[in-house]
Amino acid sequence: DWNRPIENGPIANGFDYYFGTGTINFPPYTWIENNHVLDIPVEMLNLRETKPGEGSWECRPGPAAKDWNINLVPERLTEKAVEWIESRKGRDEPFFLYFPLPSPHAPIIPDEKFRGTSGAGAYGDYVVQTDWMAGQIIEALERNGFGKNTIVIFSSDNGPETYAYPRIENYQHYSMGVLRGLKRDLWEG
């Protein structure tokens, strides 16, 4: 029942506010605010028909809100994070903003305005978009008076997928940096 509150989600686990999706590449494809679905899924979406810029698609078919566009997810999440920061302006109380970026994780789907900007293929373009997203949040912190009293932690959970090897061959782009290996390897990459 899409009208029922979501149990055991971020709000039930201590967050004051939540906006997002369950994950970018698994259904249901709809926005969730606090503990409610904003747009009830009314169609079945098969994103496997669309090809990512690089690698495998990694999207599961499933229920979606009308006119759901997976390509707009990163920018919409960024807009909402900036809006939330702006809503805190003038408040003299600490806050915690958790912003789990969907990029540059698969599916590799850089927005059109970032395509061709990196010289390192679709993944590089998605990294440029990720940098832009992080920059928007940092600019919002600065603009709203939080820049000098805020700790920003930017981290990653693993190294690149196996399709990093063609990226090395095609663009001489080593997304694992100086580390050895890739995701699921025994090495640190």
Predicted stretch roles:
Residues 1-93, 101-112:
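Formylglycine-dependent
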Residues 20-22, 119, 128:
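Short linear sequence elements within intrinsically disordered, low-complexity coil regions
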Residues 25, 47-54, 127-133, 184-187:
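Short C-terminal domain-edge/linker segments immediately following a structured domain
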Residues 72-79, 121-128, 132:
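A generic "alpha-helical surface" signal
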Residues 81, 95-100, 127-130, 134, ...:
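Beta-strand elements within well-structured catalytic alpha/beta cores of enzymes
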